[in-house]
């Protein structure tokens, strides 16, 4: 990640920046934001867990009973791409609004709107309306500001040298939600446990969790961007900055390699549940257990393993091998046709991609000057969310041919991109200006 070393950011520089002393107080001040991230991702994790078996097996008659499977997986891919598509469009605007009006007002409005969207999702499932479900998913993504607010607030009160650790807590909160959300949500959607449980029940529960989180945030969270530090912003600038992905010749290849890695990784998250439902005929309760299991190595990586590897290997090496292994393990998932093997193959795939995700961003950050960090990493985040949205559509279209195809294609994409990093980008390219990628 960014390793800014500006003057005045040491122990004495904190006072010059108007920042509080480092220590437990900083974490306590930001704790409500981590709770918001956790609650938001609990809700988001339910979409993959519930929507996949629901659409493919038509448990709730959301689609016509005679709808062919090829059309079902395409519609599922479209449905799963809508939330990140909303994020792609909404996050830059919400981030700009929080710069202008403060973090807390934007976060509170976002939370209220998102809470309402989850109620709308539950209503759509109860009414068996695919159109309303799709609209609510898109609106929820547009309103989602938890990660952008958390990152901005951390930048407000934490020095650059300390930010990696505090940003890491964001990913730890999100990955923990991917364990809790599917496990609890899968059971709440199982009518065999309680007769009145159904696909809408987890989203009503998510709405209640978000409502309580909203109330707690309003009471506890203190503004980190006071009026004296706010500034007017250009909303169009957030989008025109993306031109750098094409125009920046020095970073262009790294941008597009990262996009390929992100497309493969987020495509995996959307496509392996399709494979489980089609191949092993799993219901929502069983799917939820595998989705939660995939989250376990991500938590381990964020909590410890990535840091352990980072001090022993170069960023380039970590990116290359983790991406290659991610692709190889994806193909192994569909190559071994036993349900018991999934506990191993899914774990290995998730472990590899959990290392690859932060390594991609770090590799790009180290190739960037300090003055460009914000713009370049913003572009990278936009590429990540864009790839996440596209992956659902690509996965659905490929699965319409046969359900194993998306994981095979995405696996080959990750492996090819890793080889391009190895042989297509010179070892003497900048890691930071004037430094080799291999020198870190």
Language-model features, listed with the residues they occupy:
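A late C-terminal transmembrane helix in Major Facilitator Superfamily
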Residues: 372-401
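Juxtamembrane intracellular "pre-TM" segments in multi-pass secondary transporters
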Residues: 13-27, 222-256, 440
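C-terminal ends and interior cores of transmembrane alpha-helices
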Residues: 112-127, 324-337
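C-terminal transmembrane helical hairpin of 12-TM major facilitator-type secondary transporters
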Residues: 316-360
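Hydrophobic core of transmembrane alpha-helices in multi-pass small-molecule transporters
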Residues: 38, 117, 130-145, 341-355
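Helix-to-loop junctions at the C-terminal end of transmembrane segments
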Residues: 89-102, 301-315, 399
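Short amphipathic helix-loop junctions that connect adjacent transmembrane helices
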Residues: 50-73, 270-286
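Cytoplasmic helix-loop-helix junction between adjacent transmembrane helices
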Residues: 136-174
